[in-house]
Amino acid sequence: LGDVYKRQRIDSLSTLYQIIKREKNHNVSQVISASAIGIYPNSKTLEYDESFQSKEGLFLTNVVREWEKKIKEFNKLNIRVTTLRIGLVLSKEGGILKKLIQINKLRISNVIDGGEQCQSWIHIDDLVNIFYHAVQNKLEGTYNAVSPNPSTFLELQELASKLSYKPLLNFSIPKSLLIVPFKLIGILDFYYDVIASDKNVSASKIVNSGYHFNYPSMEKIK
């Protein structure tokens, strides 16, 4: 299933490339690729910037690596390529934040090992604005689309609690215990890529390009 998903992602880019290539006088000046910070491995100590040389790793890392390799081929068509490595997108209208708010109705939630995993996130409004910023300023190359101030998963839970106006009681589950069911059903990569995601990703490059965040920290989200 994983290989099928990866192939579908890459094949869609190949199809788009061939369509544009057939148009000798195409007027496509820029392609903005929605990539992911999943290209970076989990780490308790490193801060990742765009210069990091990713190696073959877990499923999500491999998908993103192949995706970014394929998108660079559009340069051959004299098209400016902008790759945005998107972090965890936060919005009260959908995604993980909305799910956490819904879960908070139970007033009980589980975190892994105290919820200290680093979460490199971005508010959906900033993400939309960064796409616009990339077009207006003709950005080229790879940029991390993340907030300048990453948070822990526990802080994300606390934000959901604040937005739902309900106090939340967190229970910490040891990683060694939670990993067992994922290992038994053969989706260990999903556990490391999503459930136990822990990566500190730098926003310095997009900030230095002139972008000003509306939501530089979780405290701004209300």
Describe the predicted segments one by one.
Residues 137-187:
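Mid/C-terminal beta-alpha module of Rossmann-like enzyme folds, strongest
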Residues 58-61, 65, 72-83, 87-118, ...:
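NAD(P)-dependent short-chain dehydrogenase/reductase
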Residues 136, 169, 190-222:
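C-terminal amphipathic/interface module of NAD(P)-dependent oxidoreductases
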Residues 101-109, 116-150, 158:
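Alpha-helical substrate-binding/gating segment
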Residues 1-4:
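Short, small-residue-biased leader/transition segments that mark boundaries at the very start
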Residues 13-57:
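Conserved Rossmann-fold NAD(P)-dependent oxidoreductase catalytic core, especially the SDR/UDP-sugar
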Residues 6-10, 46-68, 90, 117-121, ...:
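Short-chain dehydrogenase/reductase
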